[in-house]
Curated annotation (Swiss-Prot):
Active-site residues per Swiss-Prot or TrEMBL entry: 6
UniProt protein name: ATP-dependent protease subunit HslV
Residues reported in the UniProt entry to bind Na(+): 162, 165, 168
Phylogenetic placement of the source organism: Bacteria, Pseudomonadati, Thermodesulfobacteriota, Desulfovibrionia, Desulfovibrionales
One GO term describing the cellular component: proteasome core complex
Uppermost EC category: hydrolase
NCBIfam families: ATP_dep_HslV, PRK05456.1
UniProt key word Cytoplasm: yes
Major localization class: cytoplasm
Regulation: Allosterically activated by HslU binding.
Gene: hslV
Reaction catalyzed: ATP-dependent cleavage of peptide bonds with broad specificity
Annotated keywords: Allosteric enzyme, Cytoplasm, Hydrolase, Metal-binding, Protease, Sodium, Threonine protease
Subunit composition and interactions: A double ring-shaped homohexamer of HslV is capped on each side by a ring-shaped HslU homohexamer. The assembly of the HslU/HslV complex is dependent on binding of ATP.
Length: 181
């Protein structure tokens, strides 16, 4: 699955988790359709943050399914993600969707792939989309060699990815998960 046109980055720090996403929507290899799309949003009363890469229509379908799983499992991110992945693998319609989700709460960051994978990074940093490798590398370097908070790392890493990846811009949506009371 070749995903073009976006970068989504999650960074967990001492104060919680932040997900940042750029706003560019690209049609094919050469047409920028929109600069200010929102590909990151809060779910489950603000306790979960999610972003997507891939087809917009497919991603919204997956968001709806994931949000339903979150409600069904009372906000348990890992359980909802595993159940979502099972559904994704079994359902003939969902299997054809070309999108990936990056979901996080203050304890876990998970990548949900179209193959039904649920992957949790070891270092609390994950990225998806065409600019994902650049954002991931920049975020890891910043996390290892600075005292910056998660949001600052996410913003700066996304800025760097936007300088390198032509499918990523600097119009960011940045959301942080709320701490449970």
């Amino acid at each position: 699955m070749e995903l073009k046109g976006t970068t989504i980055l999650a960074v967990r720090g001492a104060q919680g988790v932040t997900i940042a996403g750029d706003g560019q929507v690209t049609m094919g290899q050469s047409i920028v359709m929109k600069h200010s799309a929102r590909k990151v949003r809060r779910l489950y009363n603000g306790r979960v943050v999610a972003g997507f890469a891939g087809s917009t229509a497919d991603a919204f379908t997956l968001f709806e399914h994931f949000e339903a799983k979150l409600e069904e499992h009372r906000g348990n991110l890992v359980r909802a993600a595993v159940e979502m992945a099972k559904s994704w693998r079994k359902d003939k319609y969902l299997r054809r969707l070309e999108a990936m989700l990056l979901v996080a709460d203050n304890e876990h960051i998970l990548v949900l792939s179209g193959n039904g994978d649920v992957i949790e990074p070891d270092d609390g940093i994950a990225a998806i989309g065409s600019g994902g490798p650049y954002a991931l590398a920049a975020a890891r370097a910043l996390a290892r060699h600075t005292q910056l908070d998660a949001e600052t790392i996410a913003r700066e890493a996304m800025r760097i990815a936007g300088e390198i990846c032509v499918f990523t811009n600097d119009h960011l949506t940045v959301e942080s998960a709320e701490t449970q009371a």
